[in-house]
Design a protein with these regions (language model features):
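A well-structured
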Residues: 1-272
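Single conserved hydrophobic/aromatic residue that forms the stacking wall/gate
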Residues: 270-273, 277-281
C-alpha cells in the first residue's frame, strides 16, 4: 500500500510549469492590487462597484495564495529539510509582504464607507459577503498605519516566522529513545506519538514517558523559539491596542471570553470526572 502523500493534485512539482505560472500570476496580481488600491482611496464615488471589485480580487488572490501555500507547507510537513520547499516558503513569505500596504489601505477605506448597510443591500454579491465586510470594519480599529503594517509584516519573516520554522524543524527531527520488547530503539517522534493509540497499555505508558524525556534534547532551542514568538506577540498586541494576547486571539477566533470560559469549565469538569473514574477502577 502506498503510504506517501500525493501532492500532484495541487502541483506536479516545484519545477512544474503549473507552479511557476501561478507564482508569476501571484506577482501580477500583487502588482495589480497595489495599483488599484491607490486608485480606490484617491477617487471618490462608485463605492458599490469598488467594493464588489474588492471582493472579487480578494477571493481570487486568496485562492491563489492558498494553493501555493498548501503545496509548500504540505511538502515541508513531510520533509522539513526539503531545500526547494524551504526556498519557496521564504519566497512566498517575501512576496506576501508586498500586498500588506495595499490591503491596509483598502480595509481602512472600507471601514470609512458611510451607510455601509445601504451599500450592501444594493448588491447581491455584497449581501453574500456581508459578514466578511462587517468583520473588516470591526477589526479596523486595530489597524496601524500603512507603513507600520508593512514594516511589521516584513520583520515577521526574520522574527516569529523564522522562530516558528526553527521550532518545527527541531520537533520534526527529534528522535525518541524507547524500550520495546526489551530492546532500546531510537524512533521518530511521530512514530512514538502514534503509540498513544496502541491497544497495549504498557506500550502507551512507555511511549508517553519516552516522549516527555525526549523533549529535554531540544528544550532550550524550543524555549528560545517560543520566547521569541511570544515577545513579538506582546509587542504587536500593545501597538494595536488589544488588552492582551488572549484578547487578540479571541477576536481573531470570533469568540467571546464568556464562551471560552464555558468551554474551559466543561473541560475541567470532564477531566475531573475522568480522573475519579480512573481512581475507582
Amino acid at each position: 500500500m502506498e503510504l506517501n502523500w500525493s501532492l500532484k493534485e495541487i502541483y506536479p512539482s516545484f519545477e512544474s510549469e503549473e507552479f511557476k505560472n501561478d507564482l508569476e500570476k501571484l506577482d501580477q496580481s500583487i502588482k495589480s492590487l497595489n495599483t488599484w488600491a491607490d486608485e480606490v482611496v484617491c477617487e471618490e464615488g462608485n463605492v458599490r462597484p469598488k467594493l464588489e471589485e474588492y471582493i472579487k480580487r480578494s477571493s481570487k488572490l486568496s485562492e491563489l495564495i492558498g494553493r501555493l501555500e498548501a503545496f509548500v507547507s504540505l511538502t515541508l510537513s513531510a520533509d522539513t529539510k526539503n531545500s526547494e520547499g524551504l526556498r519557496y516558503s521564504d519566497i512566498l513569505d517575501s512576496k506576501l509582504t508586498e500586498i500588506v500596504e495595499a490591503t491596509t489601505k483598502l480595509e481602512r477605506w472600507i471601514s470609512n464607507i458611510k451607510d455601509i448597510d445601504t451599500v450592501i443591500k444594493g448588491s447581491e454579491v455584497l449581501k453574500e459577503h456581508e459578514f466578511y465586510i462587517k468583520e473588516i470594519i470591526e477589526k479596523s480599529k486595530y489597524l496601524l498605519s500603512d507603513r507600520e503594517e508593512s514594516i511589521i509584516s516584513k520583520m515577521k519573516n526574520t522574527g516569529s516566522n523564522a522562530w516558528l520554522k526553527l521550532k518545527d524543524n527541531l520537533i520534526s527531527n527529534l528522535k525518541v529513545d524507547i524500550e520495546i520488547d526489551g530492546e532500546m530503539k531510537e524512533l521518530p517522534l511521530t512514530v512514538v506519538l502514534n503509540m498513544a493509540y496502541d491497544p497495549n497499555g504498557e506500550l502507551r505508558r512507555k511511549a508517553y514517558f519516552a516522549e516527555i524525556e525526549s523533549y529535554k534534547k531540544v528544550e532550550e532551542g524550543v524555549a528560545a523559539a517560543l520566547n521569541g514568538i511570544k515577545g513579538e506577540v506582546l509587542t504587536v498586541c500593545d501597538l494595536r491596542g488589544y488588552k492582551s494576547p488572549l484578547d487578540m486571539t479571541l477576536v481573531n477566533s470570533r469568540m467571546d471570553e464568556e464562551s471560552l470560559d464555558a468551554m474551559l469549565e466543561a473541560c475541567l469538569l470532564y477531566t475531573s470526572d475522568a480522573a475519579d473514574e480512573v481512581q475507582l477502577v
